Structure formats: structure tokens, C-alpha cells
Amino acid sequence: FKLKSDDKVVICAGLYFMRKGIDDFIKVAEQMPDVRFIWFGDTNKWVIPHKVRRLVEHDHPENVTFAGYIKGDVFEGAMSGSDAFFFPSREETEGIVVLEALASHQRVVLRDIPVYKGWLDDKSATFASDVPGFVKALRQVLADKTSTREAGYHVAESRSIDKVAHELVQVYEKVME
């Protein structure tokens, strides 16, 4: 990625769809030219709308990189080593990638959408609803003015497969009594 040690890096992971907020990701990057923005994920460019394809291929500033689909150590390193995880998705069913970021002790900046109600709050994540709000939130996170890492990690722990499975076993045993 040709990063320098003092680069501020914001990452995202998702498919190339407008509902994932790819357009706002780019608009935020345009307003923060001093920060590197890397989007992990891929979608066959022939099945996405022309506008999104243009954004990914060339209609984005130089501080944006579309890394494609990367897994394993490189992705895990990016998730835990970047300065923030920014997920401007307009609609989610669960937000699994958000849990991955939280489990990586990452500070997350999210669009304020209903799916996060009841399991995330301002102690575990930073929320905004538009481009100016995202820029402000990311500036605060990058300046270390937010401390959501530990609370976010505890949210991820509480929603781990092992924890949920244990709770289901307890419910099942109680029902069987």
C-alpha cells in the first residue's frame, strides 16, 4: 500500500454498492486529503452500476485505494493496525464487519442507522449521519479524542459465537427442564 510510518490510515470493508456508502467514503476522503483511505472488498465490476464502477476505477482522490478482496494476515493487520475503521453503510442486516473491527480493538466510525441500536452506543462507537459529521468524527478519532476501543471490544466479546452458543445452550436446558 506504500504507506509511511506517520500516515493516518482509515479503512473500510465491503462490497462496491451505494448502499454501503462508497460514495460518502470518497466524499469524506476528498475532504481529508492528509489521510489515507483504503477500501477492502470486491464486487464483479460488470454487475455494479456504472456510477459505482467509475468511482472505483478512477473517480476518486489519490488518497483512496481500492485494495480488492484480501484475507488472512494482511487483512487482519490492516484491521488492527489502521487508525480507524469507517463504515458509512446506509443499510445492514447485522454488521458483521463492524464486529470484526471491534474485535480487533479498532475505533469505529459508523453511519447512525437502526441496526446498531441496542448493541452499540457512543461508548463503543462514534456515529454520524452525513459527510460533514463523518469528517468531524474521524478528525476526533484520529486526534485520539475518543476512547471507544475497550468498550467496543467488550461488545464484540459479548456477541462472539462461543458466548452466543453458551447462552443458547442455557436457554435450551431451561426449556427442557
Mark where each language-model region is.
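Nucleotide-activated donor-binding/catalytic signature segment of Leloir-type glycosyltransferases, i.e.
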Residues: 50-70
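Short alpha-helical donor nucleotide-sugar binding micro-motif in glycosyltransferases
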Residues: 69-70, 77-82
